[in-house]
Structures are given as structure tokens and as C-alpha cells.
Amino acid sequence: VTLTRGDLVGYVERDLDADLARWFPGRTPVAVPEQTRPVAPFLGRLAPADAAALAAFDRRVRSGRMPQFLDIYSWSYGFDFAANGCGIRDSDYETELTDEDVYSIGADGGGNLYVVLTTGQIGIWFHEEEVVEEGTRFDDLDVFVWSVVRYQAVRAGVLERAAVEADFLSLGQDGVLEPELGLLHSMK
């Protein structure tokens, strides 16, 4: 059976906790300061399904119980771009975005941030160019989190690449398939 985006709607709320417990039981839990930028104002800019996924993710991040799997720290979750003097440009390298247009949910290990856009897409904000690149995107948070959890499980040696590769291909996400930056490339 081919996995579709529709199959993953509600993943963060429904299945994330079980997957994290299965593959990452001993990992240190995420801890962000109480004063971390609130997500509530951003939720109103999202479609209902995207807002539900981000709200569910935020509850887990702030619970102090979610295992670390996405470089979620005080500097990467709810990052305040303006207060830190950082610009944000869309993939056309011209359209200026603001903190109202994105919400950062973690880092990639190289100083780049994963951001939720008001379209519901997830992209990578590259710190050197201060741009959210087009070829790095995921259609929504449920698909992104599902993909990153499995990517990290493969990297940790608790899941075989062959067990997820067909699903990654069927979902057709740029953030997985991009030849140089995609998750599949990084699993080699």
C-alpha cells in the first residue's frame, strides 16, 4: 500500500508519541524556557489542519517530556528573527518575510532552522543567506515530523532505510528528495 499525505494528517497528535517512545526511549527530553516565543499568534495564520498539527507539536515541545530528535533548543524553537537581527527572505531571494510569516521549530545541526510558513509548509531557513530555500520544503508539519522521526531512526540504527525509502519516495517531498540537501541523500 502506497503511503499518501492524507494518511499522515493528524500524525503529530495521533502517532508521534508512540514513535518517539519506540525509537528514542533514552534520549534527553526537549527543554525550552517558559519565555520562548508563544505559538498562539502564529496559529491563527494557518489553515485549521496545519494549526492543529503545530499546536499539538508545541504542547509536546513545552511538556518537557518529548525526546530530542530535531535539535529543539532555546535558540532554535520559536526563534525571534527580528530581535536577533536576522533577515528572512522567501525562495525568490527578494520577498522579505517577518516573524509573523514563519515560526521556527528546530534546527538541522548546521545552524539552519526548520520553519513553518503561513502556507503550512515547512522549509529550511539558511542562516548564511537568510533565505527559506524552495527545494527544501515539506507540504505540512505532519509529513515533516513523520519524515524526520524516521530519518533520525535510520541514522540511529533502529530502523532500516529499506523500511522507509518507498514511503519517502511516494510522499514526493522536496525536503526528502532534493539531491544535495534532502533527507534521503543524508542517509547514504
Segments predicted by a language model, with ranges:
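A surface-exposed partner-binding patch
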Residues: V1-L113, V176-K188
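Generic alpha-helical structural element
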Residues: L8-V9, L46, E130-E133, L169
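Short acidic-glycine loop/turn motifs at beta-strand connectors
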Residues: V116-G120
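Compact, glycine/acidic-enriched structural inserts
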Residues: G123-L159
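Acidic, proline/glycine-rich low-complexity IDRs
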Residues: V149-K188
